[in-house]
């Protein structure tokens, strides 16, 4: 199995990316949450992966965090949910939002995801209730490289290394990069 790919981002076009690993380009489908947090083309990227082997293809799916990959794998276990639908769910809802919807049995949040109807949403809520990924067991795992991205953004905005490092350490784990930057800026403006 291919568990992680590290290389240079060669191209990106939603929902796919091409990662060049020593001259071999891997085509990887990613949820939009991962896509929006990717570096620029030509920069180094690392993605956790899930390899799906079908009769007619070997497909790679990439994720920015272990939590996201674990959620994808749990979604695949739900009857009637394939890889494309699982990616659609993770593109439409963050793992934390999906976890909250499952815990509260909020069918309305799930049916807003393109490709998910009422029956599929009901099945999803029923089959995923109580799963550790969605019960919060993995919710504290930070995104791969998220804290470094936040630190780099704050340094680019003119904050010094000491205050940046202290602020990043205080951020809650598991935040998306954009939200982490917003919270860090709020914390720095209060200091």
Swiss-Prot record:
Gene behind the chain: ruvA
Keyword Membrane: no
Keywords from the UniProt entry: Cytoplasm, DNA damage, DNA recombination, DNA repair, DNA-binding
Subunit structure: Homotetramer. Forms an RuvA(8)-RuvB(12)-Holliday junction (HJ) complex. HJ DNA is sandwiched between 2 RuvA tetramers; dsDNA enters through RuvA and exits via RuvB. An RuvB hexamer assembles on each DNA strand where it exits the tetramer. Each RuvB hexamer is contacted by two RuvA subunits (via domain III) on 2 adjacent RuvB subunits; this complex drives branch migration. In the full resolvosome a probable DNA-RuvA(4)-RuvB(12)-RuvC(2) complex forms which resolves the HJ.
NCBIfam families: ruvA
Ranges where the record places region Domain II: 65-138
GO molecular function terms listed in the Swiss-Prot or TrEMBL record: ATP binding; four-way junction DNA binding; four-way junction helicase activity
Domain writeup: Has three domains with a flexible linker between the domains II and III and assumes an 'L' shape. Domain III is highly mobile and contacts RuvB.
Region (Flexible linker): 138-141
Protein name: Holliday junction branch migration complex subunit RuvA
Task of the protein: The RuvA-RuvB-RuvC complex processes Holliday junction (HJ) DNA during genetic recombination and DNA repair, while the RuvA-RuvB complex plays an important role in the rescue of blocked DNA replication forks via replication fork reversal (RFR). RuvA specifically binds to HJ cruciform DNA, conferring on it an open structure. The RuvB hexamer acts as an ATP-dependent pump, pulling dsDNA into and through the RuvAB complex. HJ branch migration allows RuvC to scan DNA until it finds its consensus sequence, where it cleaves and resolves the cruciform DNA.
Main location: cytoplasm
Organism per entry: Thiobacillus denitrificans (strain ATCC 25259 / T1)
Subcellular location, record wording: Cytoplasm
CDD domains: UBA_RuvA_C (cd14332)
Region Domain III: start-end pairs: 142-191
GO biological process: one example: DNA repair
UniProt-annotated stretches for the region Domain I: 1-64
GO cellular component: cytoplasm; Holliday junction helicase complex; Holliday junction resolvase complex
Family annotation (Pfam families): HHH_5, RuvA_C, RuvA_N
Family: Belongs to the RuvA family.
